[in-house]
Amino acid sequence: MTASPLVTADQGAVAAPDQAFFDSLNAEVNDKGFLVTSTEELFQWARTGSLWWMTFGLACCAVEMIHVNMPRYDMERFGVAPRASPRQSDVMIVAGTLCNKMAPALRKVYDQMSDPKYVISMGSCANGGGYYHYSYSVVRGCDRIVPVDIYVPGCPPTAEALLYGVMQLQRKIRRAGTLER
């Protein structure tokens, strides 16, 4: 009978795990074709490959958002698919000028999304007000209403820029797991 690596011989006290034991066990299992990981890492991997996004197209940036779904860019090859309901989506792309009257609707839609939820701010108007920055009716950046994870600059940003922003979000999720707010 072999002793467990977590229990010491004296008084049966629990000690720190023996790293060499786990390394040898991991090497033995890997040789047989198995994958050893934690459930959190598995969920994190699945989350990066199945981002469902919801459009919040407010102005001309929404046209560029449509382009990434066409065959030339085909955002679905990265596991990103559009959804019409906020309850089914975990990424919201805010594209265009956000007015004061639209801000409560943006917050309401954001609150209806399931956790974990991410926001991509697309274009100069969504990032900071854009050309309409000094207007009385414009919110100077959607980050004043909802927390933003990725900013895509440009007026309007190209479809390649949005695609790059989605890939940056996937890297951010892979690197940090769920993003705590």
Curated annotation (Swiss-Prot):
It is a peripheral membrane protein. [4Fe-4S] cluster binds at residues 60-61, 125, 155. The gene is nuoB. It comes from Novosphingobium aromaticivorans (strain ATCC 700278 / DSM 12444 / CCUG 56034 / CIP 105152 / NBRC 16084 / F199). InterPro entries: NADH_UbQ_OxRdtase-like_20kDa, NADH_UQ_OxRdtase_20Kd_su. Its cofactor is [4Fe-4S] cluster. NDH-1 is composed of 14 different subunits. Subunits NuoB, C, D, E, F, and G constitute the peripheral sector of the complex. Keywords: 4Fe-4S, Cell inner membrane, Cell membrane, Iron, Iron-sulfur, Membrane, Metal-binding, NAD, Quinone, Translocase, Transport, Ubiquinone. The lineage of its organism: Bacteria, Pseudomonadati, Pseudomonadota, Alphaproteobacteria, Sphingomonadales. This is NADH-quinone oxidoreductase subunit B. One of its GO terms (molecular function) is iron ion binding. GO terms for cellular component: plasma membrane; respiratory chain complex I. Belongs to the complex I 20 kDa subunit family. Pfam families: Oxidored_q6. NDH-1 shuttles electrons from NADH, via FMN and iron-sulfur (Fe-S) centers, to quinones in the respiratory chain. Couples the redox reaction to proton translocation (for every two electrons transferred, four hydrogen ions are translocated across the cytoplasmic membrane), and thus conserves the redox energy in a proton gradient.
